Amino acid sequence: MKNFKNQNFQKENLNLSFSQKRKKFSGKIGICFFEYNFFQKNFHVQNFPIKKCRLLAQVSEQTPQISSFRQTSNFTPNLIKKKLLNGYSKIHELKLVTIELASPEKIKAWAEKELPNGKIFGEVTNANTFHYRTFKPSKGGLFCEHIFGPLKDFECACGKRQRPSALESRKILEHQKTSRYFCPNCDVEYTWSIIRRYQLGYIKLNAPVTHLWYFKTNPSYLSILFDMKRRHLESIIYCTETITIENTWKYSQQTSILNRSPKDLYLTWQKFFTLEEQLQQYNRIYQNKHQHQKQRKLEFRNLSILQNKISPQINWKNFDQQIVEKNQNNSVFAKNFQTFENIETFGLKRKHSIFENISMQKQKKFGTYFFEEIWKIILQKSYKNSFLFLNSQECFSEHFFQNIYRISNIFLFSSKKIQKFLKFHEIFIFGNTESLNKTILELKNKKRTVNFFSKDFTPFFIDQNVFESHNSLKIKKQYWKSFFFLFEFTRFFLSKKNTKIQNLNVLSKKDFLFLVNLIPFLKKLALFQNLQVFKKNTKKSHAFYIQNLSKKNKSLKKKIFLKKNLFTEQNLISFQNQVQKNKIFSVEPNFSEKIFSTFFSNDFLNSNQTFEFNLFNLFFDVSLNFGKILAFLKLYYEIDFCSFVQKHSFDFEKNYSFKNSFSTKQFELFSNQSTLVSMYETVFFDYFSFFFHFLKIFKFSNFNMSNSVSLEFLNDSEKENIFYSQNFRTQKNFFFSLKALSFLLVGFNYENKQNLLSDPFDSGFEIFPNQNSVFMTQNFFSSKLFFKEKKQKKNNSKKLKKQLEIFISNKPLLSRQNFTERKKQIQNKKVQKFFDFDSMTENFECSFSSEKKFKLFQKKVSNSSLQLTQIQKKFKEPFLYKFIKQKNQKKKKFNNFHVFLSTKANSNLFFFEKKQKQQIQEKFQKMEKNHFLQNSILTIAYNYLWNNDADWKYFIYYNSLFFYEFEDHPIFLYRSLSPIKDTKNNQAFMFSDTNSSAIKFGQSFSSFLSWSIDDLPKNFFVGAGILEKLLTEYTSSELRKMTKQHQILLPKINQMLRFLKQNAKTKKDSLKIQKYFQKREQIIRRLKFLRKFSRRNSNPTFMILKNLPVLPPDLRPILKLQNQIAASDLNRFYQRIIYRNDRLKKFAKDSATNQSFEIKYAQRLLQEAVDNLIQNGKGSVKAETNSRGQPLKSLSEILKGKQGRFRQYLLGKRVDYSGRSVIVVGPELKLYECGLPKEMALELFLPFLIQYILQNKLAQTVVGAKNLLKSDSNLTLHLLHKVIKNIPILLNRAPTLHRLGFQAFLPKLIEGRAILLHPMVCPSFNADFDGDQMAVHIPLTVEARTEAWKFMLATNNLMNSATGEAIILPSQDMVLGCYYLTLDFQSKFVGVQLSNLLKKQNSFFPFSKPTYLGKEKTFQIQGKNFEKFGIQNKAFLLFSNFLSVLNAYQRKEISLHTPVWVKWNSNVDFGNEFSKPVEIRLQINGSWEEIQPKYTTFYNYKNKQLQKIIRTTPGRILMNFMIQQCSMS
């Protein structure tokens, strides 16, 4: 056997070859849109090319895997292969085919292929097939070579040929992964043309379409799932009826002008937010509690003020509802808005205790109830996303939370209306209170740490003289700005809405909810830049202006430069009268305003009217361009919903370094000989903004020692104090802005100084390939962009330029998955960072610590340009710069920035070297161990889905009132621009001045700019789109609920049916029972369907088609036959679908028809076209016909039936070593045997016979062996018996519906031409002996035979694999036995004989008259009459009971089928109780007899039954006894 295997069967290349190696096959069938996964651990096609094995199914092979080896990593593939080839073991098993619904993405993945150049092909876009002259496939058509492969082997559309090498060809045949080659010109793959037989394409449908097999079958699956009648479902699908919900959905799809009046906006939002109703119960319960808490709070405040523990202003009295009502004059408000310096008088421990105590109070007050009740309501009512606007930038400043967190931590407000939502902001903005307190305690041993709390924060409009005139004061934040403006704006808004409102200081809960929802409204209007509105309308804001704009120092006439008003220049200039006349207001056009200027009316941008008037006009301008702007900002749908929080802790704020900016060569940017002017700009990023909120100029605080002592003579500690207390307050703001996600460097042209900025056209992308960062530089070169100092000389007044640097980390942002983890981590006193500051500073160091100049400053500045003393020149390269270099060499990440101190006398620079070295090192260690550092990007995962799309539309609308703020450039650049590389100079350009899409970009960015509103995905709420919308509600959890509901409902219906059956009396009750039966059947059917969906976690929406597979072109060919074109009918179907799909797209684009009846009709035509492709003419749809009027063959006709693709070509293929014949019964066979005709066996086993003859040298050649077999029949029969002894055969009966349709048998040679089969095997094959045919196959290899013996032998397949029940049962034998026992074949003969006998006796009553003996009334028959009645063989006998019959049978006096008469007075079922009697006899005494064919009944004159004699057989009596014994047992 070993030689036999090695010579012939080791590498067989046949269809039925098997091996022990398990392969995974994954096939896709286009018409069914099912996915088949066939895990076959025992079989695989060994060397046979996969392309020859599949026709409709696409098979992708993967690496062999065995479940037992998955846990062991030491096994190599070769070792696994050796293990598998050694023999069989328990790990070999056969898994069944699994079928599941194919998603639209899966269908798309089947067809698409991506080229190395990034192009993707697979979608069929036009209906063209071949060119009528050249007969070449049309590009993008139904026979396109890009999609389906080349027409000739390894030849592209250009005519170029590129065949693979022999090694690559071998790898391809062995299914090993090889690189694919494409033509660079025509993008056609170099491969075999046979791929056109397997490569699918797809058509992207512009509207969803329902699959025909799911709603026109019986039962209709969609109608079961929706619990809807099939005719109603079809009317929705074919757009003949309109459901109510359709109009609701359509309304949400309208992107036309929204109502812009304040009243309509207010009412619209009121519909979506009904939190007021749900909070009523809470307010009733806690009303008394709140009042009590308020009273205790006032007592605590008064007590604290009396004990001088805390300043009155800390409690934010301006927000207290009662105090606001009492104080209505300007002076009180101005007093309330004064600076809060009193807290500085306390020690650090006192501050810590205050923070801790009040934090505990707040947490106790709001923590428990907020998270249990309010937070749930917020999530339910879509408050989650609206409340995110309360994070960070609603406070309109990146520095606000740094200060408010340190100074007052939790002292935010005392208004009852606002406190309800405090805990939310505490978590998402402030982090954890204890972390702050730890940070404060770390500084308790430092000298003058109070100065850290005194960082001067500039208000919205600040006079820079504040730092000189009030230098001794520690100016704090005046209030929480976001809620202040929120409060004020609501007052203004409500006053416009209702002029009757008098007291606007008290807001109702409903107004407050509206106020909270208008936070994006407020933010987008940038009200902090348009405060004149509030000045005109509220006293409070007027007092605020007086507070912040009245501080001035008349002795020093300096300039403050304010940013231009967001909308009009005139607004800001008109405000000039409120400030000093010597102040200059610069005009700075907004960057985003410049980009999106095409979206807004020029009249509005150039308007001279005030902001108050134009407030709601902007709504109209934006709404007109809503769709265009939304399309332009496509990436909004792709990015997470982001908010940017920029803050840091105390220890780190001086470490946010932009190191190279303070080298001595670049110090010129910030210093001047005559006056020291430090100009810096703090940049804030709102959610989707790119404009600059503040532009501020600060004077350095001129340091004058009171004793006129020179600074050089100060000791180290005093130097340190000066460093911290004086300059650090202003300088750290600048460096913190450099740390931000995006930063600005502002350059100025002073006297006798050259322009330091680079050429404006040298901007672009500056890529550092060795770093994990990308810097995008952008130049602005317009005289309007920047302000200029008027003191400059006229000749040297040049255009000022500004460059924008954007730092982008390549690390991923926060994913949706760990968003919930982030909330927990914040509560656990940690802030998770998306990219940490460590890596960012490292990138900064690597980028800017090089010796050559930074790109901003291309011209070097010599030391002579600065008037430096000798001491300064010694410290030309400061110590901290050296220290940073050392840190870089050690690969440490944090660095310190350079500080300098300016004096009024000259421009002396002092760098402290002695004291700080050790101190800085200690701080680095602290920062590395325990730091509370929030990154500048806070990404909130947006994963909430509104139930109604209208909510989403209004959400977009309210959060993008000014769409030039809607775009988020940092994320935008992170997603789109970071992979862009220009091969020439690594540069990219961002936007032009006028048209943002006019400049050349990389591929991905240009596609973004060219994206139009036509590409915006729309939901078609007509036809199948309605069903798709409904199916989205059938989530896995919802399906499980429905399943459980039906399981509960079913027993109740059964109980109701039992009750109705017991009490049914009228016909109405019967009808009711019938209805309940129908309802039960419907519930059972629906329950089975729902249970399958819920258990498999299948998505019901996959029953709706969005992508339609296109069969490979070789399965629907177009051929030239004798100068004529022969085309497959499928091409006509696909063309019709493409035409109607384009028609629907045309209607959908046009706003005049996208909601009209035309689009409904177009949807119906598309649905009918797809239906005809799947099954032509099914139901009421008109069938597609050819020119002769004959219906075209659809996919169903091609696949189903005996002439279909499966049974005709796949299952019915002609194969070698096979035969076919009629089966007849062979009851004498054993279960595993079959009778094989000698003639067929000789033909099938001929190769084996020849091989045996040649091996035993009975003949020398094959011809000689054949002659020997023909000449000697006895030898042939002898050899044939020997050969078939160990070779099983496989029998198959079509159709092969399950694996038991193929079974192995041991052949037994018989005479004749029919195959003998054991009758008990018939149920497995679903066969009978009425002319059925079966096919015979011979397994060739040793492996195949072994598996045939082990797995496929008939005796090994006794159970049904699907149900687990026995499939080989003696059912026919039992039926035959029962039939034989109850057979009455002699009845006719007995009846004739009995009638003849009676005629001979001349008496119809052979017995004597019955006599009645008393009450017993027994019927006696005289024994002498038996002799007259006797017949030969005792054929006609009368027995008194059944036992006497059985005794006669045992004595062999009668047989099983002998008719006998037996007296029997019990009930007997003859099956024809009400048939007409054969005869009725009347006696003289009034008694009578009723004679039936099988029994006779005797009655007395009172019609009372006396006796019954039945005719039966002993076999039937035996059967009756057996049934009674079974029932008793």
UniProtKB/Swiss-Prot annotation:
Q: Which residues of the sequence carry a binding annotation for Mg(2+)?
A: 1328, 1330, 1332
The protein's required cofactor(s) are namely:
Mg(2+); Zn(2+)
Q: Molecular function terms in GO for this entry?
A: DNA binding; DNA-directed RNA polymerase activity; magnesium ion binding; zinc ion binding
Positions with a binding annotation for Zn(2+): 156, 158, 183, 186
A single GO BP term for this record reads: DNA-templated transcription
Sum up the protein's function in the record's words.
DNA-dependent RNA polymerase catalyzes the transcription of DNA into RNA using the four ribonucleoside triphosphates as substrates.
Protein's recorded name:
DNA-directed RNA polymerase subunit beta'
The protein's organism comes out as: Tetradesmus obliquus
Q: What is the lineage of its organism?
A: Eukaryota, Viridiplantae, Chlorophyta, core chlorophytes, Chlorophyceae
